[in-house]
């Protein structure tokens, strides 16, 4: 039985261990870059629960899935976009956990007043492409990068304008991993 819950500073070690358990290929898919253990530790140190929302999925023993929501700069307070980073432990995949984490992220982002949710991922990550399309996101692929843009205030297939905006996001892609390694949190 899995338990989804919001995470805070007390969960840093669980987050670190979860991300360290990811294989090099999994880390590349999660962060869109090759990441060593030091990078993971700096990334976790840079997480700020007062700024970011962290949703964790725990089994009986440890954190097996993580959604990280970060607010992106956008057109003002009424035009908030949330970027989501997602990771699921290898042995827990293909069980709907990614979908559950995304649904929880979507509900949390909507409750916080966000208008859109964006997910960047490697175009070779077919599971993420399928998941984001099932959520109703506009997905644009350009080379080895893909971006999914989800309008949080509408249901159904994405309109053409959202698809075009997703295309512009791919062109200006800057991953969520711009975390200051010296930041003290």
Where do the model's predicted regions map?
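Terminal substrate-recognition subdomain of acyl/acetyltransferases
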Residues: 86, 121, 126-185
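Conserved acetyl-CoA-binding loop-helix of GNAT-fold acetyltransferases
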Residues: 88, 94-111, 116, 126, ...
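Acetyl-CoA-dependent GNAT
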Residues: 21, 29-80, 89
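Residues that cap or delimit alpha-helices
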Residues: 8, 23-24
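Hydrophobic alpha-helical core bundles mediating ligand binding, dimerization, or RNAP-core interactions
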Residues: 15-19, 23
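A short beta-loop-alpha structural element at the N-terminal edge
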Residues: 2-14
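Short catalytic-loop micro-motif centered on adjacent basic/acidic residues
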Residues: 30, 118-119
């Amino acid at each position: 039985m899995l338990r989804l819950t919001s995470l805070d500073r007390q969960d840093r070690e669980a987050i670190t261990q979860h991300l360290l358990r990811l294989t090099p290929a999994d880390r590349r898919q999660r962060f869109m870059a090759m990441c060593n253990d030091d990078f993971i530790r700096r990334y976790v140190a840079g997480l700020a629960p007062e700024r970011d929302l962290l949703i964790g999925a725990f089994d009986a023993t440890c954190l097996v899935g993580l959604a990280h929501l970060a607010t992106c700069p956008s057109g003002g307070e009424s035009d908030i976009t949330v970027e989501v980073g997602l990771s699921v432990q290898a042995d827990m995949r293909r069980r709907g956990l990614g979908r559950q984490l995304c649904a929880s992220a979507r509900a949390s982002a909507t409750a916080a007043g966000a208008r859109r949710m964006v997910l960047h991922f490697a175009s070779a990550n077919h599971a993420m492409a399928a998941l984001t399309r099932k959520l109703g996101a506009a997905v644009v692929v350009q080379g080895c990068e893909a971006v999914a843009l989800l309008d949080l205030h509408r249901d159904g297939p994405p309109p053409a304008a959202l698809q075009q905006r997703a295309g512009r996001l791919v062109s200006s892609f800057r991953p969520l991993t711009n975390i200051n390694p010296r930041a003290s949190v």
